[in-house]
């Protein structure tokens, strides 16, 4: 597996992977419109989006972020791992890639919106293992500058 900056040639495979991951969680797989134009919704704003690629050049995971205006914080988006490859460190590697990048550009905190605990139980288990704490209902946050000590 390798983690790379998103490239347009992977768009359809990324969308398919995310829809498949949502379906596996028992959710009606809807398309998030930001995924239709990663360039405009992430890169053109100065933000980033990464994908995990397997040995067959297929998308097996993703994560991106958008900066919160007038702050040094970001909101993480679209951290997904292909359903049959969960619990193999792919999500952790994607999150670490994003956090290391954020620290390198001076961001202070990452925020994630999780939704309710009943429907998003995997996320509610994953993020606390990586230092995220709930600070508002359905939101978790990690102070990035503290995490590198």
Describe each PLM feature range.
Residues 5-77, 82, 95, 101, ...:
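Acetyl-CoA-dependent GNAT
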Residues 95, 102-115:
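Conserved GNAT acetyl-CoA-binding A-motif
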């Amino acid at each position: 597996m390798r983690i790379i900056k998103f490239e347009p040639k992977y768009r359809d495979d990324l969308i398919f992977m995310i829809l498949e991951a949502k379906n596996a969680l028992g959710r009606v797989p809807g398309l998030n419109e930001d995924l239709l134009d990663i360039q405009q919704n992430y890169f053109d704003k100065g933000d980033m989006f990464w994908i995990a690629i397997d040995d067959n050049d297929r998308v097996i995971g993703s994560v991106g972020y958008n900066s919160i205006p007038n702050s040094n914080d970001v909101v993480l988006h679209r951290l997904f791992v292909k359903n049959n490859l969960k619990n193999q460190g792919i999500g952790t590697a994607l999150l670490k890639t994003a956090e290391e990048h954020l620290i390198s550009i001076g961001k202070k905190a990452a925020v994630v919106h999780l939704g309710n605990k009943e429907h998003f139980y995997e996320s509610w288990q994953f993020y606390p293992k990586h230092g995220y704490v709930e600070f508002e209902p359905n939101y978790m946050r990690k102070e990035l500058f503290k995490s590198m000590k």
